[in-house]
């Protein structure tokens, strides 16, 4: 193959009388062979390799290997992918900017040029994670929540404004605008990017990585992208390619159409269940089939959004006529739309009817078989048919109590002077929230229409339900108002509370005090119903043990019913003014009614709301910062502190030390999420982080959340493994971030034990089951363990992003051999761990792990090194990816 394949494949195309240069896959195919049936998602990767071919980071062999994927629908090769841009939200963005600022300090200390610490590709940071539902249920809720958000986060927002002026190619979308993935879908995403290079306009596929796992939503627009940890995103924006293995691609064939009364939410919960069962971790999923001909882009985005929940790297929908239709609706220019169509067709990236690419494996779903569903009570893949929810709730409640005897009596309480009874199974939170569904006009209009019918019949929200509406963009408010549905949602308590993530990420705010007291008094198992994408235990609210994902209209329906024990398929939701029962079917809007309402959504709404997307409110504009290349760290700050990760860094890496005499800090079960490892929600006053804040003069009311404090490593290391629902098997029957300082028997916080081990210079290990690190792309779930002194995590399997994050922080991920677990080994957590010869580590190698039991007996377990690529090994040997990037800058 020609060493100048990149040059040989360069071609031009015309769009709107403008000439664009591009790297043509059909021209490349003359050397590579027929690539017509390569999955469209891999064609995006192939173009990327072709465009970046330099003979070093991208070679002929890399391009040949990706084109040769077709032979076996698999390829064992590491490639270097360079996304066009980076997307961030503020919870992950603040610590990323802290790292960049700290890197500038390190480069300065080591005699380098600080201006090299600058993004080389566009970075958009959307502030969406900080608004909390403190106020709800009235017309003032939005203004009050915004006021509190600005008050609590003033220092963080000052820091982000400093970053905006200090770093090039770095844009900030201010708070109160929308959710990053919805803003990306509706405005930032281009499908095809173009830029002026050496006097030529170059066209290439839009692509990105994001510091949030639901970055995958943009794949609904035909834009390849996925979530990575903040540390990997920082490296990407500084010019470091994303190291990855060429993925397997699972084809998901969609046929037929959804039946009357079935929503995109029901569809995505079904797809999630099927793909989780199939096993797609580390793989691409690509959707195909004639069912796509009638699947709106908003529905595709909903499915793509939940890729982390089904475990795939991404869920890709190729560009087609429906993509262009959505781009026009959302206010993209005619020039861009024509370029997207012309480019996609020229490159073989356009979806044609009957396309059957080659896939590693396939699944098929007739959308006519999808039924009304929820997912819960603790995992998004646990789909439950609507009529089976009471049984699923009862089963989970019994499991929680470890007994079949469940007879919890209602608890009397008084609110606003009125006496009530709070039943077991009460729905205490009903939230229309999350980009997953609020990006979808059909389910939002359905919720509004259902509310209208309910109000007309005289139905009311149950008094113990905290209801909220938090759309992912202001466009939602515009079209609900245009359809005259806002007053009905308001009447049922679904007033606007903010434009941001809110309940979906755990910012549900406090429940009314009488409700919290009643739950505790009766030890009630209560529920939250939300239109989000995650329902892990302890995530939505500390007192809410069961969480259910549902479509927006079902969220409204559960607010009316107020109880998870009611069967919405057969039982009445409530009673009308005459006392007659009202069933869900009586108020569920028809497909025709929904379609008429959706027709009111216009491109003018999108253009109006996104015209000043970077401007922000008067409060945002009033935040003043001084211009400087390096940040003026405040020693008394409890939000922003200079991170210690580069304190002892030298210009050359030291050899990797073997692990001798490591103690187990925690022994955990299956599906331990990054929420368990590094919670984002509220900080308990009696926790190590709570005590730290109080010792630094912060009152309880000003604690804010762990997520908002990610710019302060002192808070975050104390919050590591601090989820109130985590279960360390070293302390049976105990919930929360507790452990033993071995060889002692006393229970203490994981943080306190880790500090004692550090004083003794004892390295630490974590033992876990399957799917360790699932959930959010939370880099503090790797940074926190690093600061606690954890050197190795040994698990049955890892979720993709977290495994990468561990390596990025210099922590070794090891996998037990097939069929071997902590249980088959009979581990107690009292074992001492030794791992030798780490200087000669190889990707994927078998590593002998020696376990010394408390009786002195030894056992060696051959574990698999989950450092998968040579590039990852280089990062590990440099003590982390950012250390490697800094050393590159210095050299």
UniProtKB/Swiss-Prot annotation:
Ligand binding ([4Fe-4S] cluster): 435, 501, 504
UniProtKB keywords: 4Fe-4S, Iron, Iron-sulfur, Lyase, Metal-binding, RNA-binding, Tricarboxylic acid cycle
Entry keyword Zinc-finger: no
Keyword Heme set for record: no
Name used for this protein in its record: Aconitate hydratase A
Quaternary data: Monomer.
Phenotype when the gene is knocked out: Cells lacking this gene show no phenotype during growth on propionate, acetate, succinate, glycerol and glucose. The acnAB double mutant does not grow on propionate even when supplemented with glutamate and is unable to respire propionate under anaerobic growth conditions.
GO cellular component terms listed in the entry, alphabetical order: cytosol
EC number: 4.2.1.3, 4.2.1.99
Swiss-Prot/TrEMBL GO biological process terms: propionate metabolic process, methylcitrate cycle; tricarboxylic acid cycle
Family: Belongs to the aconitase/IPM isomerase family.
Pathway(s) it belongs to: Carbohydrate metabolism; tricarboxylic acid cycle; isocitrate from oxaloacetate: step 2/2; Organic acid metabolism; propanoate degradation
Function: Involved in the catabolism of short chain fatty acids (SCFA) via the tricarboxylic acid (TCA)(acetyl degradation route) and the 2-methylcitrate cycle I (propionate degradation route). Catalyzes the reversible isomerization of citrate to isocitrate via cis-aconitate. Also catalyzes the hydration of 2-methyl-cis-aconitate to yield (2R,3S)-2-methylisocitrate. The (2S,3S)-2-methylcitrate (2-MC) is a very poor substrate. The apo form of AcnA functions as a RNA-binding regulatory protein.
InterPro entries xrefs: AcnA_IRP_Swivel, Acnase/IPM_dHydase_lsu_aba_1/3, Acoase/IPM_deHydtase_lsu_aba, Aconitase/3IPM_dehydase_swvl, Aconitase/IRP2, Aconitase_4Fe-4S_BS, Aconitase_4Fe-4S_dom, AconitaseA/IPMdHydase_ssu_swvl
CDD domains: AcnA_IRP (cd01586), AcnA_IRP_Swivel (cd01580)
Species of origin: Salmonella typhimurium (strain LT2 / SGSC1412 / ATCC 700720)
Cofactors that this protein relies on: [4Fe-4S] cluster
An example molecular function term from Gene Ontology annotations: mRNA binding
Note on cofactor: Binds 1 [4Fe-4S] cluster per subunit.
Gene name for this UniProt entry: acnA
Pfam families named among the record's database cross-references: Aconitase, Aconitase_C
Catalyses which reaction(s): citrate = D-threo-isocitrate; (2S,3R)-3-hydroxybutane-1,2,3-tricarboxylate = 2-methyl-cis-aconitate + H2O
